[in-house]
């Protein structure tokens, strides 16, 4: 194993909350032995900030951005790709879906857009509280049931069950497997030497393309148990029983 790639929310952290001291310390131990990479749906700035500028490489917006955070905590965007995005058309489509699904009550904006061309359908709106988001669809079953209709409404986009209460839209062909495979080609790393760590390999999850491609995968069901789930990657302390 040469490269360990990570999802963020639900894997290393709670949804949009800072990286804990324990998981940060564990990542530091892993970084002494492996190359580490974040593969995220959000942009590199958001990911690096949430991680407290932990030194790591980052693929943001499903691979549309590539950045590094230095040992001193400096974020450098090394590649950024953008595609045109019709905000009016996407917002109108989201509004149609809201009426169809009964999601007409929301706080903030009905849709969220990123400079890259990625977009988001935040079911509860852009200003919903974290508590509201976490309570909305904890097992993702509500959104999975609606996923075929949402995908049909956005044929030019990859559509995923994203975050705690949203649907992510990324311009085709950008998804986490596309991003990871491209990174590996550019850096001379075989996919057979990659371990991916994520929390949602199921239908519609944004980790699913990586899982379905056969990349070695460790599924995390509680970010607080990350060190326990990945302990096999580190040598036993001297004197430990086998």
Where are these regions (language model features)?
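Asp-based phosphoryl-transfer active-site loop
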Residues: 2-17, 180, 207
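Conserved acidic, metal-coordinating active-site core of Asp-based
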Residues: 100, 105-195, 203-206, 213
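Hydrophobic "anchor" residues on beta-strands that sit immediately upstream
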Residues: 3-5, 57, 195
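Non-catalytic pre-domain segments flanking phosphatase-related domains
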Residues: 1-6, 22-25, 29, 239-242
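Conserved cytosolic headpiece of P-type ATPases
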Residues: 8, 16-18, 195-202
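Asp-based, Mg2+/Mn2+-dependent phosphohydrolase catalytic module
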Residues: 187-191, 204-242
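Active-site phosphate-binding/coordination module
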Residues: 17-109
């Amino acid at each position: 194993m040469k490269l360990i790639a990570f999802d963020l929310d639900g894997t290393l952290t709670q949804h949009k909350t800072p990286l804990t001291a324990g998981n940060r310390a564990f990542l530091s131990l892993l970084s002494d032995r492996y190359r580490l990479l974040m593969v995220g749906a959000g942009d590199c700035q958001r990911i690096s900030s949430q991680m407290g500028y932990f030194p790591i490489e980052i693929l943001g917006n499903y691979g549309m951005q590539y950045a590094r955070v230095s040992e001193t905590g400096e974020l450098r965007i090394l590649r950024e790709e953008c595609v045109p995005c019709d905000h009016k058309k996407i917002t109108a489509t989201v509004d149609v879906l809201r009426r169809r699904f009964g999601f007409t009550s929301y706080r903030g904006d009905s849709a969220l857009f990123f400079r890259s061309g990625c977009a988001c359908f935040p079911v509860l709106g852009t200003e919903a509280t974290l508590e509201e988001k976490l309570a909305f669809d904890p097992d993702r079953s509500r959104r999975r049931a609606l996923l075929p209709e949402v995908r049909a409404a956005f044929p030019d986009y990859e559509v995923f069950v994203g975050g705690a209460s949203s649907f992510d839209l990324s311009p085709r062909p950008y998804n986490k497997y596309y991003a990871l495979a491209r990174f590996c080609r550019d850096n001379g790393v075989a996919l057979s030497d990659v371990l991916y760590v994520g929390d949602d390999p199921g239908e519609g999850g944004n980790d699913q393309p990586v899982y379905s491609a056969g990349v070695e995968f460790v599924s995390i069901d509680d970010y607080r148990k990350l060190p326990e789930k990945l302990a096999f990657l580190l040598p036993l302390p001297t004197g430990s029983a086998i």
